Amino acid sequence: MPIDLAIDFGTSKTVLLSGNKIILEQPTVATVDSETWEPVAFGDKARDMIGRLPEHLESVFPIQRGMIADYDVAEQMLTEYFTNSLGKHLIKPRVIIAMPSGATSIQRRSLENAAEIAGGRKVQVIDSAVAAALGMGIDFTRPGGKMVIDIGAGVTDIAMLSGGGIVQCDSAPIGSLDFDDAIIKYVRKEFNVLIGQLTAEELKKQIGSVVPRKEEVIIKAKGRNLFSGLPQLFDITSTDVYLAMKDTAQNLFSAINSVIERTPPDIVADVMCDKIYVTGGGALVNGVAELLGKNLNTDVLVRSDAEYSVVKGAQAALKQPDLIKNIDYQLRNIQDLISNLE
């Protein structure tokens, strides 16, 4: 029996969905041999090795800002994930894979090629924001503007949708990983302590917020003292983490405002009378929905399963081929226009 496979090949996480069931969810990271560049581990195993590797091995993140940064590793990772989740089938799975709207035709084709070599057939690429809209059950086939924001780990996709198509779209190179980087820089500057990416991520999840918390929270964190080089245990507050994150949040909202400013007034009016739909793992960062609603003076909807909206929408898109063909045509025209302006 033919298999349909929807993929969210994200900067920090890869999710495979088949038959409305998540069949694989793994970090988008590999451990490779430094000399041969041959992968020795993928996913959770590779993530657990970050910061703990011997000299002959290194961590590689094949997707950067939503685009393929290392084609060979990306291809081998998809092959590994396909095999682990599906086993061996006589009929290759039909594949649809999400990608930021800012991707060029060359970048889109590169991703299609990687998925085909990994074992997919009839590979399609869908815009992440469109997939997110479908995954949230938004009907944008009728007149009336809908605004969808997909905040991923490395990139944020912003789209104005109406009448079954894209009115305005953009991809901003800002995501939830930038909050982690901001926390690392803040701790280094204010505490003279170096912390790793995983520690920063935990601080973001536990006490992070892009708005001041009503009650101060203090937790202990571990790092390495920059002067002595020794391990150090230190107290960090929710206010510290807020101060670390707030500038990145402002950069994110500036990118969103830029799309709104380029959108026809009637579509903007529709959005303001309805709500803004926010999805992606970054949507779950504390205070994002609150601050966005306050800045734009409108309601914001974030679902509890926001990090899976894109892959669910990608699967739903397989049942609407005409809609996807129309949107793909629009995106290619938008990219051609941008290229001509450059």
Model-predicted segments: where are they?
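Nucleotide/phosphate-binding catalytic cleft detector across ATP-hydrolyzing
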Residues: 1-151, 160-276, 283-306, 310, ...
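Positively charged, low-complexity, intrinsically disordered RNA-binding extensions
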Residues: 156-157
